[in-house]
Amino acid sequence: MITGNPADSIASTRRSFLATSASGLGTLGLAHLLQEQGLLGAEGEGGLPASPLAPRLPHFAPRAKNCIFLFMAGAPSQLDLFDPKPKLDELHGKPLPESMTKDVRFAFIKKKTAVLMRSPRKFTRHGQCGMELSDFLPHIGSCADDIALVRSIYSEQFNHHPGQLMMNTGVARFGNPSVGSWLNYGLGSESKNLPGYVVLTAGRGSSGGTSNWTSGFLPSAYAGVLFRSKGEPILNLDNPPGLGPDLQRASLDALRDLNSRRYAKTLDPEIQSRIASYELAFRMQKSAPELIDLRDETRSTLDMYGVDRKDLPNAGRGGGKNIFSNFSTNCLLARRMVERGVRFVNIYHASWDHHSNLEKELRYNATMADQPVAALIKDLKQRGLLDDTLVVWGSEFGRTPLGENRGGRSANTGRDHHPFSFSIFMAGGGIRGGQVVGETDEVGWHAIKDRMHINDFHATLLHLFGFDHERLTYRFKGRDFRLTDVAGKVANKLIS
């Protein structure tokens, strides 16, 4: 029977019960087990629990150290950007065979009257590799020899929020850690003055919101931290009036001591996270404003990214005040973060959900993204950072070759959700550039060659960072969880 103050009870967590109920060599053995599972941190200076973001070694030699994931929320049309389909010109206005659509669940398309829709875009070849890309992406086209374009990604999720969860966390349900959280859990962070995982947003916001960068059941130290590119980088980071640095330091030291005592009793990793977050916030009061201060960047660099660009008119879903400048600035900040040791940077833009007005709105979004994304790749390469920085462009799914016909429209001006085949591209970080991997059928309905499920993409990403995806696990509620769930196969064709 357990007695005493319930607040101090050794039964307050399963870990504390296991740790305190053992004795002698049993305690040492248990501590070793917890350490192996990542549930018990090594001691830091002065006997304090080590930071959960302390650097750690992967399973084998990594090719990548950092990742910048550009997430175009809403699902860009791969047929109008990355995957040319001349057959759609021939079949424009004709229905697909019923055998291809009878068991398909659409978000909005009415099956009985749905017909194929051509792309008005011109595709041209770029680089020595001859990669075909849309005329909406001339700047990215200039990076073709550094890019691996995958045209055969697929998923089972056809609605935005589940699809975004699938791409960002490996499963289509709430409560699981995101890719950036898994990498910081596995590797720790090389930055002492900035978070290991930073999120930058532009546009109207993704439907998945913060669930896309959550730490899930991992300790909260591994969650993404939302930064703002202008003004106060993180809300409420500054001291309130009247709180000087000496009093602040004394308060933090007192909190650290109290939390360390509690950690010694419970071994709760959330207490480690709390100690680390307080100390990091203190250091970021100086480092975060310095990060977003671009006055030390040359004019040529600012112009390359387009940080002073003016928005185009007719924005549609992807617009917002100063969206061109904001997205460009976010790409530049991502490079500055990688230089400062940030492990994982997410850049979100929304929305690319073009159910209608595809021509106008895709032109707007692509023009916004094309220049700064290409500048990011080129800038990283010029500075010697691309070799160990993985850059990813992706989204939750693609768009249908069928035009969207809801509402009785006489003309189709958009495309519906399409998880059966879509495109992503990667550069740097051990990726073999200048290649196209995968192939879809003649109308872009199914991936038919080198098919790559999202779990396979995640397995490949972890491999580039030195991890066997089946061994990077975290025990939660009696089960070992991993980013790739119960699947995943490394796509070796992508790796140099």
Predicted features, each with a name:
Residues 1-496:
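Ligand-binding pockets and gating/stacking loops
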